[in-house]
C-alpha cells in the first residue's frame, strides 16, 4: 500500500486515533505500507524504517530511533523538528571545530552551569515552552517546563551523553 501525506488534512483530534488504528491494522494483517510524509509523528511512531530524500536522492535510511538519535545531517535532523547546530568546542572540552546537532530537549536549564545564555523569547507548546536563547552569538532553542522572561540570563546544560553519541 502507498499513502501520500495521508493525514495532512485531518484535524489532530481525529488524526491521532486514525493513525493508530490504521497502522495497527496494517501491522496485524502484515501489510506493507510506504508512507510519503513531512510529518515526523507518522514516521517516528509507526515506521519500521525511515528513508529521507532530498532533491530526489536518498540521503538517509535507518530505523526511526537510530535516525532520530544519530542524524547524519542537519537536513535529516530538521525532519524531526527544531534542531541546533553548535560547534563542539563551544560546549565541551573538545578542541574539534566539528559541529554537533542537538534537539531542544537535549539542552536543559541549569543555574549552576558555566554556560550562560540570554533568553530571547518563550513559546508555549503543548505543556512545555520552547525557549529561544542567545548563546555565544548564536540562536539556540531548548525546552523547559516553565515560562522564562525575555532578557533573563540562564545557565544551560548540554547532555554529555548526547554529545558523546552524536560527536562520533
What do these predicted regions represent?
Residues 10, 67-70, 78-79, 110, ...:
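Residues that scaffold the ATP/ADP-binding catalytic core of kinase and kinase-like folds
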Residues 93-168:
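Non-catalytic connector elements of ABC transporters
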Residues 40-41, 73-74, 85, 148-149:
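Alpha-helix N-cap/helix-start and coil->helix boundary motif
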Residues 69-91, 99-101:
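C-terminal boundary and immediately downstream tail of ABC-type ATPase nucleotide-binding domains
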Residues 65, 89-91, 120:
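Conserved positions in beta-strands of structured domains
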Residues 1-72:
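ABC ATPase nucleotide-binding domains
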Residues 34, 85-87, 115:
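Structural detector for hydrophobic anchor residues on beta-strands
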Amino acid at each position: 500500500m502507498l499513502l501520500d501525506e495521508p493525514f495532512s488534512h485531518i484535524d489532530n483530534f481525529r488524526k491521532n486515533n486514525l493513525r493508530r488504528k490504521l497502522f495497527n491494522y496494517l501491522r496485524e494483517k502484515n501489510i506493507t505500507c510506504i508512507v510519503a510524509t513531512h510529518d515526523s509523528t507518522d514516521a517516528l511512531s509507526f515506521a519500521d524504517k525511515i528513508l529521507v530524500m532530498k532533491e530526489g536522492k536518498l540521503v538517509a535510511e535507518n530505523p526511526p530511533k537510530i535516525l532520530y538519535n544519530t542524524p547524519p545531517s542537519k537536513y535529516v535532523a530538521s525532519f524531526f523538528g527544531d534542531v541546533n547546530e553548535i560547534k563542539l568546542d563551544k560546549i565541551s572540552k573538545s578542541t574539534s571545530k566539528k559541529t554537533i546537532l542537538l534537539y531542544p530537549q537535549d539542552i536543559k536549564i541549569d543555574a549552576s552551569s558555566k554556560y550562560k545564555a540570554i533568553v530571547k523569547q518563550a513559546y508555549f507548546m503543548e505543556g512545555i515552552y520552547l525557549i529561544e536563547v542567545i548563546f555565544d552569538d548564536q540562536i539556540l532553542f531548548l525546552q523547559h517546563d516553565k515560562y522564562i522572561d525575555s532578557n533573563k540570563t540562564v545557565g544551560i546544560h548540554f547532555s554529555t551523553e548526547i554529545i558523546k553519541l552524536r560527536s562520533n
